[in-house]
Amino acid sequence: MSPATVITPNGVEKSKRTPLATPLPNPSLQVTADHKLKQIEAPVYAPSHGEVLLHIKATGVCGSDIHFWKAGRIGSLVVEGDCILGHEAAGIVLQCGSGVTNLKPGDRVAVEPGVPCGQCFLCLDGRYNLCEDVQFAGVYPYDGTIQRYKTHPAKWCHKLPDNVTYSEGALLEPLSVVMHGIKTAGLSLGRGAVVCGAGPIGLIALAAARASGAHPLIITDLEPRRLEFARKLVPTCQTYQVDRDLDAEANAKQIRKLFDVEAAGEYGAPDVVLECTGVESSVITGCYTARRGGTVMVIGVGREIMNNLPFMHLSLAEINLKFINRYRDTWPAGLQCLGGGILDLKSLVSHTYPLEKAMDALHTCSDLSNGSIKVQIIDEVDDVL
């Protein structure tokens, strides 16, 4: 396949797809290989076999969208050409391609953005999040969801309960990341936990850890406004503002004091640390914070190489340093959490922008000084087909 060839999530080259005339334009937000953003009208295609055509109603802006824009890559994932951004999405089915039996026009769905090959040993083993041939929306060369019309395999579209909004449906993707991390970490009822980072992922992790029964529960961040928001989201949590003048080990000692380790001993230290920043100093702090035999789950995406991890401490204390890549089999459970009232994440959406101002949404998300939590791009137009 040449670099100029773009494949859609069902493996069909765009050049072989059937264009579809629509009554409204299809504005999209694209990132370029030279680190620019552009808003242009994108083509619309009829759904192929097994696909549905969606009207994307809400897309959340993720930190990875900012990385692709500013840095042009995340690890080995490189922006080599124009690509529509966005992967945290919900929408409504407009058309169904042949062979689709699980959805019909009018169904409201959350969009699971990764489409694995379904044939490798990892897919056959149920670990499709590790598929090397996954086609992930918003990761070059696969167009994402910051557009009005998008085709997607019906298999990876999940019906929304009637009481779950499109905005909440667009939170399913980051919630899925957290759910996979919590399950892999083995978070236990009544055991202490620390969440490092009060950004969108960290705040969702805080709410999910509380719903999972973790206690005591502490969240850390450099930004006091985010910690204030965390206390409103989960009033029973404690907060710790990271001290820039202290090193990672010293900050960890201060965090452990909140668990009353001096009185309870090492047993009282947090059993699980959910590291949601990907920042090296925060990962190191998490390693020193977890109790001996505990787990540090790195959920945040950080640098390709970290050279300063406390290897000997991790070894002698038998700290389980774990990692996740996206998620698997989390979307149905996530919908149950939202529809069943187990989690209420609506307050995380701090800013919304219409689709035509999607570029403003990314600028807002990239500027930490404005206090944004989760920025979403919405499209409320009707009669789109």
Regions found by a protein language model. Name each.
Residues 117-196, 245:
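NAD(P)H dinucleotide-binding glycine-rich loop of Rossmann-like/cofactor-binding domains
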Residues 214, 237-244, 277-342, 379-385:
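Glycine-rich phosphate-binding loop and adjacent beta-alpha segment
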